[in-house]
Regions:
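Conserved NTP-donor binding/palm subdomain of two-metal-ion nucleotidyltransferases/polymerases, i.e.
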Residues: 1-229
Length: 229
């Protein structure tokens, strides 16, 4: 933190969740991750549990190997897609990677993602990139994905996120997760739980008291979808 602030960045987010966020006017936004994936995107946790082993390094400088790098880009894209949707820029990023001089083997990247159970949707996202920017013909899967993305805005929608979670966990499961998030999720937002797990009930209570006043519009949208569903 001291290094970043010494470089002129202001700290926007520190010590909880999976990353710290720094901002420097007019446009620089830097996320420093403690983990590549948290509770959201947990299906990729096993794939990227030891990211250092997926890298080449020169002294203290580590870089993902090309196929591992693209696998991570895909995983991050899928995570956002399933959280609530994603924008056109994400698909453009995939095309840029595939047509860069990195010599990426997309097939190997898909293979790396197989343990997550998300390799198929990752493949469809990469295929959509070729449809939009490479002139490839649509398949049924890419057309459905295109329609979903066009309805997602730049960063996805709360409604999409809620519907996706209800589909995975059921209505009651989603409701309980809203009220009582998992211990893993709570640790990301209440670091004290790393030292004192016994405080989980107290943190749940604190969250229930404060949550109605934070992101109020988002919370109301989640409840609206839950009641409608």
């Amino acid at each position: 933190r001291g290094v970043m602030e010494g470089l002129g960045y202001s700290c926007e987010h520190f010590g909880y969740d999976i990353h710290d966020i720094y901002y420097k006017p007019p446009v620089m936004n830097v996320e420093i991750h403690r983990s590549l994936f948290g509770e959201d995107g947990r299906e990729f946790g096993a794939v990227f549990s030891d990211p250092w082993s997926m890298c080449t390094h020169d002294g203290m400088h580590y870089s993902f190997r090309p196929d591992e790098f693209f696998a991570y880009i895909l995983a991050h894209a899928v995570k956002h897609l399933e959280e609530g949707g994603t924008g056109i820029r994400t698909i453009m990023d995939l095309w840029v990677c595939l047509h860069s001089d990195m010599k990426i083997s997309a097939e190997r990247s898909f293979e790396l993602l197989e343990p997550s159970g998300r390799a198929d949707i990752a493949r469809t996202m990469a295929e959509l990139a070729e449809v939009w920017f490479g002139g490839k013909a649509h398949s049924g899967e890419t057309l459905r994905l295109e329609q979903y993305i066009f309805g997602s805005g730049t960063y996805g929608t709360v409604e999409n996120s809620a519907l996706n979670r209800i589909e995975r966990s059921g209505k009651m499961g989603y409701f309980m997760r809203l009220i009582f998030p998992t211990f893993t999720h709570m640790k990301e937002h209440y670091p004290v739980l790393n030292r004192a797990p016994v405080l989980l009930p107290a943190c749940w209570f604190a969250r229930l008291v404060t949550k109605p006043f934070v992101n109020r519009r988002s919370n109301m949208e989640k409840l609206r979808v839950l009641m409608k569903k």
